[in-house]
Amino acid sequence: MRGHAPDSDQQRAFIRRLPKAELHLHLEGAVTPETLVELSRRHDGTPLSLEGARAIYDYTDFTGFLMAFKAVTERLRTAEDYELITYRMLGRLAAQGVVHAEIYVSVGVVYYWGRSEFEPLFAGMERGRMRAEADFGITAYWIFDAVRHFGTDAAAKVFRKAAEMRRDHTSIIGIGIGGDERHTGAAPFRELYAEARDAGLHLTAHAGESVGPEGIWGALNIGAERIGHALTAIHDSELMAILAERQIPIEVCVSSNVRTGCCMHLADHPVRRFFESGLMITLNSDDPAMFLSDLEDEYWLANNEFGFSEEHLRELAANSIEASFLPAERKIDLLRQIEETF
């Protein structure tokens, strides 16, 4: 992190005071190298050193990122592991002024590793979530994420598990598809999304991250209520107009897009053009431990690199609350708090 001048420190303090939601965050991608070492000591015959763990997070493209994500998930094996990473993640979020988070958990990857029972692992996540709410005042919802390139049968298992478990766990709020969209578009998941919607689940989708605007059109066509990334929408004026007209929330992840090489240069990121075009954007960290940028940093980038004023940042924070799946009463209270933040 760069050194800060006094006015920079004041701006960061404002960002921390600003109540905001994190809407595009992967539980597994929030595992720091230090915690990965701790997990490795629990499960590996030859544990990782801190240097070795940091090397896993050192990559140059989207494929390298997927391999780093794999290295973390293969060391998440017990309820205690999931409780640990959930509690630590939410504690770090609360320290940045995050009041609510909607967190992707890669249930599809859990099944990929052959762990047939997800419920015991989820029990650990819930313990971590409830401890964090009691200790830090932050709330959280879960979004069960399927891996698109594992296919529709694998996704069906994830989405139906979300519907089944939601009957007893209202913290399970929605479903999504992540993974490598270069291999599989959204269209094959249309019927599964309709089934999930009918089960009372909200619908999200990663789209337009590593492919063109057609990926975003596909996500809209299967009913996604929020779009993760949507980076390439900037190349399709008709799509930009539709997104602005419908006010479909876009979960923008600036540092993520640059670090994975999906956007080659920070200055080229369309976040400012999205905002000026009237899109309903929110700022998010995606995988903060892997991209070395938390939500506070993303707001700082918006201010320092893209010229977003304090009033703009307040608008982005309000967008994050409005785009969340929180009940209306809580949204109204948090929006009031944002207006009162100076």
Task: Give the residues covered by each predicted segment.
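Metal-cofactor-binding active-site regions of metalloenzymes
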Residues: 1-201, 210-215, 221, 225-226, ...
